[in-house]
Amino acid sequence: MRSFRLTATPGSTLAIAIVLAACAGPTSPNPSASAAQSIDAPQAIAGTAIRPHLEALMEIATDNGGLRTAGTAGYEASVQYVAEQLREMGYSVEVPEFEMATYLELPGGTVGVDGGPTFETGDDFKAMIYSASGDLSAAVTPVGFANNESGGCAATDFDGFVEGTIALAPPGSCFRRQVVLNAVAAGAVALVVSYPQYAKGEPRRPTLLSPDGIDIPVLSATGELGDALQAAAEDGSQVHISVATQIGQAMVHNVIAESHGIAERVVMLGGHLDGVHDGPGINDNGSGPAALLEIARVLAEERPWARVRFAFWGGEEFGLLGSGAYVDGLEADGRAEIAAYLNFDMLGSPNYVPIVYDEPGAAAGSSKIADFLVAYLESVGVAPERMDLGGGSDHYFFTEARIPTGGLFSGATEIKTDAQADAYGGTAGEAMDACYHLACDTVERVNLDLVASFANAALAVTLAIAGGELELP
């Protein structure tokens, strides 16, 4: 997931509610939604119910090379686990497939500076998802450092670029794909994006969304490697890059499960099931599917009248591919049938901030969902922040289809402020999830109480929409 600016709201300690109570916020135009609404919870979801699902996904990763990446055996085993759980609960389950480009970086990649150190893939850099292979030597030309907010996102950042050199850029405000396309157009033979905040062993692997048009190596580098390349640019040293990647095609599955309720419209809840190339993906995003499975269990046992659809997406880490394929395949009637889509991605960050999606320009009804979730969490002792997640997770295509959307999130690489540490505990000055997209994203680091609290909030808003207490367009 990408990092976004957060809007602060005071908070307090976390609790798990037995009664789900919520009220819409003062901006709600619906008088009935602005009145206090009390929903009798069929049962509270506890962290002890969440943990077995996380352990099952961790075991799947361990049995499959430490990964659950879409297009791998680890991901398909995750699909089988989720589908079996839902069938045992009595849901109608489908596993529709979609085709996607797969990606793998082969071991042994290096970046060397003439007369200087050699840096290795994994520890010092990673080839971004859909990077091309390459074995080349060239000088370095820095771009975008005069305006770090742009960071190569604008074609004008490459004015005066020396064709045939390696482009070195800071992290900008756009998707990395745009920077790569600008670099290719300017004649770069490779692109290295330097992340000053990443130390040795910590580089992440952003996605370039598609291999189309990407014919140069594209690397995500630590601050140390970035500094070495800056020095090489200043003294004119040659830099050698050797990296090998494999790009293929695979049929990958989503999991779609629906209850047998009789309402005309369906409430849809989802979260991505795939992990990254560099770890087991337990908080990101085993936590969302684990919460969804327990919500599904409660609804199946206690509220069989509710018409609810659950989605477990593949290919999110490559660029929201599974959810995009699903929404693209919906006819107009199928889109109109969905009363709301609720997204759950990264619910248990250890240095968390509780966050409610609140996106300007989202479909009518989205603000009511956000107000409801905020009011629910406040009622159980958590005052969440609101965030515009943009295109950072699987709600994006539902938002684009003008379906009301909402969701919950607990933070990724965003740095916790002093005010947030005062409000929620944890450590100021550190990432909300220091193991985001790394091998250390394991069960032991997940905040189970937070996942459970979020699951109860999701259950509350689902029942409110399904039962008509929260009216949406």
Question: What residues fall within each predicted segment?
Answer:
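Metal-dependent peptidase/peptidase-like ectodomains
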Residues: 262-264, 277, 303, 313-417, ...
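Extracellular/luminal Protease-associated
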Residues: 72, 120-220, 280, 384
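Soluble metallo-hydrolase cores and metallopeptidase-like ectodomains found primarily
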Residues: 124-153, 210-282, 294-297, 301, ...
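His/Asp/Glu-rich mid-to-C-terminal helical/loop segments that flank catalytic regions of hydrolases
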Residues: 415-473
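Noncatalytic luminal/extracellular "stalk/propeptide" segments of secretory-pathway proteins
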Residues: 52-55, 59-163
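N-terminal capping segment at the start of a domain
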Residues: 35-73, 98, 108, 274, ...
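C-terminal motif of bacterial Sec signal peptides marking the signal peptidase cleavage site
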Residues: 19-22
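Short helix-loop-beta-strand segments that form the rim/entrance of peptidase-like active sites
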Residues: 211-213, 296-321, 344, 471
